[in-house]
């Protein structure tokens, strides 16, 4: 680890402890509203993560989907995440939904991104080690979390997913966001990127560059779908769910 990151370690440890407390409170609030919520807690020496863990109702599970919501989102968010929560177990997938990450608005861009990577990497490894996940493991990540996970896949993330689905990926710092563009199309696993006109403006601002990069690289593992007229209504959410399930089947999952 470089010297510029060593100075961040005490801050990262403090923030991670704060995140765990906030995430636990959010799950308890959801559980009070939904008493049948199936929660599972994973613990290590310095990390505790509580997740929603739903097993498929089918006799032959297809694998495990891990959903990583964006900030201020959760398993019951009234858009695509909630629709996936309801439909994926019926389609044969065991489902784990992580709590959304928390960040502080006054962080410098470099510190924020490093903190996001550290938190997400630690959570991912803990779930992989203790979750007894049925393979293949598919990651569905949303918004800024999707961009952070994609960056980790280009670095040293162990126990990588078999495939990833990215929903409106962006980084809150625009310069960092632009720097990650070239990474999206150069994937070594099946990768589906879904972007709509209702996603973050940064995701929209670079859509043409992403399309051009996809054409230039001609990577058969990378697929992108952009929907200019997409709306977050029930029929569109169902359409997106069917698009995801169809893509998974096309790739042999």
PLM ranges: what are they?
Residues 18-20:
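N-terminal signal peptide c-region/cleavage motif recognized by signal peptidases
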Residues 24-58:
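N-terminal cap/lid segment of alpha/beta-hydrolase-fold proteins
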Residues 56-93:
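Short, surface-exposed "cap/lid" segments of acyl-processing enzymes
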Residues 106-132:
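Alpha/beta-hydrolase active-site loop
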Residues 136-139, 163-165:
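Residue in the alpha/beta-hydrolase core beta-strand immediately N-terminal to the catalytic nucleophile
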Residues 140-150:
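Gly/Ala-rich beta-loop-alpha elbow adjacent to hydrolase catalytic centers
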Residues 158, 163, 168-223, 227:
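The feature captures the conserved acid-bearing segment of alpha/beta-hydrolase catalytic domains
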Residues 218-253:
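C-terminal catalytic histidine-bearing segment of alpha/beta-hydrolase fold enzymes
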């Amino acid at each position: 680890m470089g010297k510029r990151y060593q100075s961040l370690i005490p801050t990262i440890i403090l923030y991670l402890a704060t995140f765990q407390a906030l995430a636990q409170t959010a799950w308890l609030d959801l559980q009070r509203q939904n008493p049948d919520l199936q929660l599972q807690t994973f613990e290590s020496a310095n990390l505790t993560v509580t997740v929603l863990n739903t097993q498929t109702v089918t006799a032959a599970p297809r694998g495990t989907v891990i959903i990583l919501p964006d900030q201020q989102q959760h398993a019951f968010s009234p858009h695509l995440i909630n629709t996936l929560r309801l439909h994926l177990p019926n389609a044969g997938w065991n489902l784990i939904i992580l709590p959304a990450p928390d960040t502080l608005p006054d962080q410098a861009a470099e510190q924020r991104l490093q903190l996001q990577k550290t938190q997400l990497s630690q959570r991912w490894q803990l779930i992989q080690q203790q979750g007894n996940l049925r393979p293949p493991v598919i990651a569905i990540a949303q918004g800024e979390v999707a961009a952070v996970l994609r960056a980790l896949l280009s670095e040293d993330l162990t126990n990588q997913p078999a495939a990833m689905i990215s929903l409106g990926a962006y980084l809150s710092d625009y310069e960092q966001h632009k720097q990650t563009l070239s990474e999206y199309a150069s994937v070594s696993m099946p990768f589906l990127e879904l972007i709509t006109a209702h996603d973050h403006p940064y995701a929209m601002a670079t859509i043409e560059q992403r399309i051009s990069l996809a054409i230039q690289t001609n990577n058969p593992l990378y697929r992108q779908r952009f929907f200019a007229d997409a709306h977050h209504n029930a029929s569109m959410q169902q359409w997106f769910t069917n698009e995801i399930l169809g893509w998974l089947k096309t790739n042999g999952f």
